[in-house]
């Protein structure tokens, strides 16, 4: 591993989340560098007013590697992630690592990602996300956002952009030449579609459970109102993905209709004191309704206000 001379570019995308970004950059400045690699860092700001530039300027002197700032004027998740790819290719990167601007990376984060990446010979690796929930979070929130690790170095189907590293062969024009799909700019799931496109071309992904990032949840994201909106949007986006690939439409639609019918049937009993919390049933109904809306063309712009 020490003689590989891989060049890793860490890409971070941000939009109007200044305080979390400061914590993210502070943690990044303290990471260990994998032996035998060159590491560089790219921050892509989706704010046309370059609102994150002053934060970048304040932290670059603490970084143990070269840093670059870019403003991407085209709004959306796919646009900023593709900008990371384009700039990383210009830097002749052999691998790209990504995490989110509301996350804190562990000191050994990059070392662990790279270790599994090299040992497995895979095209990409996915790390572990620990969610730091607000104090007094409900049991429902804790159940919906569990902290768990995948077993070491197993095959996975998703390369989540909140904690991953992948070979530039996936994105190089001379390789698989995959990009994030602009159709999912504001809906999310752009990393799921990216992963599917890579898998369809024969790519292999592995888990790197010791590569840890910590995501801080705000109080707003722990409210039932937020969860309703998020689950409805997720249902819509799942339908968008299914329509994009035209697979599993009929079977999934039948499943969602039956899910709505069943949960509407049992909901009155839950409200009267059943053993299961009615909130969970309401969320599942909401997600199923989102799927049906997405099936008929409705879209969600959940990520218009920020980049996750």
Language-model segments: what does each one mean?
Residues 229-234, 246-308:
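Non-catalytic, C-terminal membrane-associated alpha-helical segments of glycosyltransferases
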């Amino acid at each position: 591993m020490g003689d590989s001379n891989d060049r890793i570019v860490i890409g971070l995308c941000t939009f109007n989340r200044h305080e979390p970004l400061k914590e993210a950059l502070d943690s990044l400045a303290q990471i260990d560098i994998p032996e035998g690699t060159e590491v560089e860092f790219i921050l892509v700001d989706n704010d046309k007013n370059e609102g994150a530039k002053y934060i970048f300027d304040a932290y670059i002197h603490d970084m143990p590697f070269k840093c670059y700032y870019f403003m991407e004027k085209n709004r959306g998740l796919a646009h900023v992630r593709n900008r990371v790819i384009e700039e990383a290719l210009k830097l002749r990167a052999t691998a790209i690592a990504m995490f989110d601007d509301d996350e804190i990376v562990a000191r050994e984060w990059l070392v662990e990602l790279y270790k599994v990446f090299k040992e497995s010979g895979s095209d990409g690796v996915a790390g572990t996300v620990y969610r730091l929930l607000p104090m007094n979070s409900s049991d429902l929130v804790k159940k919906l956002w569990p902290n768990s690790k995948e077993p070491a170095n197993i095959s996975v189907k998703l390369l989540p952009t909140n904690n991953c590293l992948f070979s530039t062969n996936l994105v190089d024009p001379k390789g698989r030449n995959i990009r994030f799909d602009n159709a999912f700019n504001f809906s999310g799931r752009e990393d799921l579609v990216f992963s599917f496109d890579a898998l369809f071309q024969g790519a292999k992904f592995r888990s790197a459970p010791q590569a840890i990032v910590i995501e801080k949840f705000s109080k707003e994201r722990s409210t039932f109102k937020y969860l309703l909106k998020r689950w409805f949007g997720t249902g819509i986006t799942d339908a968008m993905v299914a329509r994009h690939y035209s697979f599993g439409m009929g079977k999934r639609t039948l499943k969602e209709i039956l899910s709505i019918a069943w949960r509407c049937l049992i909901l009155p009993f839950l409200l009267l004191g059943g053993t299961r919390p009615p909130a969970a049933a309401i969320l599942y109904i909401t997600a199923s309704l989102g799927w049906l809306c997405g099936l008929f063309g409705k879209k969600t712009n959940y990520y218009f206000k920020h980049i996750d």
